[in-house]
Amino acid sequence: MENKLLCWWLYWPCVYSSIIATIISFYTITRHLLNYRKPYEQRLSIRILLLVPIFSVSCASGIIKPEAAQFYVDPIREFYEAFVIYTFFTFLTLLLGGERNIITVLSLNHAPTRHPIPLIGKICKPIDLSDPFDFLFVKKGILQYVWFKPFYCFGTLICSAWKLPKFEIFLNVFYNISVTWSLYSLALFWKCLYPELTPYKPWLKFLCVKLIIFASYWQSIIIQGLVVTGKLGTGNQDRTSGYVYKNGLLCIEMVPFAILHAVAFPWNKYTAFSIPYGARMKFIYALKDFLGCGDLIWDFKQTLFAGPLYYNYRNFDPEAMDLLSTRQQSGATMERLKHGLRFTDNGRNSYWVAYGSIDNNLVPESIEESWEDDIAGQRTFPEDPNYPVVHDYTMGHRYSRSMNDLRRDVQSRSSMAC
């Protein structure tokens, strides 16, 4: 049944926009799954692309059945919104070669980065990502929003069901602190490694993630302000009408967001034309890979439970020559020396000195567990030696370097003959 709070000429464009945005996003996701040649990169891209369909469905539900959507659909959207911030951070980390490469190689060439906000800069020391503890601080700052969001959604439902406006105010204050801290930590990471990120043209990807979150957040505040001032909504339905109009506006915006996401995270760079000799996963295994949670569980455990036991100087130990050829007087280098790092062979090698009979800087065996990909761990079926990957030999050979050279040679000879 149509929602009576929206006129038909507003209601149906919102519904159709949600459907169109969902179709665009699922088309892009499907093409990724059919060309699944870089699992570690594409699983993150698909998880980010999935944000638009989730927003589209939840916003459409919000204008069709606002009461039910607030309780059953919105918490899913809220949690996934936070999850995408973490996924985007992981995506940037992957582009730069992983956490170890960032800490032990890339960040050694940078001076510590001052906080962009002067007041914070006077209180907190500059961020040096070559220090594992600083990297952990930034990563936890991003992840805490993901951990906080389920509690926030649960608390919001309790406040709505039991009519607790005062508790809801405090909950919103903590929510704003959490989301601000998360975005600020992501901005710090961005600022520290911007020269290394520039070749990957990250601005479009950054806008995809940030615009949809900012649009949802600030439009909600503006519309709520219009409701409070009496500019929007009448009678006892003020709060519901504000909720419906907010979701209706987001429905319209989902179409350009879907197009923007498809451009920022394209599937065509993973085709046989772009990677001629690269094998791809079958569709069903690609689907299983991006829906799997093994990488998330491992990363959450190492960050939340292991913490400094994993992110310490010994586990993230740069090469001796790299450490000496860069900023020798950096805080991270001096801290490594304090924790037992020593150089030998005129700085060509290094070793660690263990103080006392127990080396308390190493990771316990119960925590240091290697993560195994579910797909990589599958055994090979005798009837299919390429399981679970497929080689597109015909397509790959057609776009190989040798065929391209031959094609250019034929074209040049043809032009000379003419």
Curated annotation (Swiss-Prot):
Reply yes or no: does the keyword Cell inner membrane apply. no
Reported effect, residue 384 to A: Stronlgly reduces the interaction with ATG8. Impairs interaction with ATG8
**Regions crossing the membrane:** 6-26, 44-64, 79-99, 142-162, 169-189, 206-226, 247-267
From the UniProt record, which GO molecular function terms apply? Answer: transmembrane transporter activity
Compartments annotated for it: namely:
Vacuole membrane
Its signal peptide is: none
Give the span(s) annotated as ATG8-interacting region: 379-402
Q: Which UniProt keywords apply?
A: Membrane, Transmembrane, Transmembrane helix, Vacuole
What is this entry's stated membrane topology? Multi-pass membrane protein
On the Cytoplasmic side, which residues?
Answer: 27-43, 100-141, 190-205, 268-418
Effect of mutating residue 371 to A: Stronlgly reduces the interaction with ATG8. Impairs interaction with ATG8
**What outcome is documented for mutating residue 373 to A in this protein?**
Moderately reduces the interaction with ATG8
Topology feature Extracellular, residues: 1-5, 65-78, 163-168, 227-246
- State any GO BP term from the record: protein targeting to vacuolar membrane
Q: What quaternary arrangement does the UniProt entry report?
A: Interacts with ATG8.
The molecule here is called Vacuole membrane protein HFL1
Identify the taxonomic lineage of the organism of origin: Eukaryota, Fungi, Dikarya, Ascomycota, Saccharomycotina
Q: Gene encoding it? A: HFL1
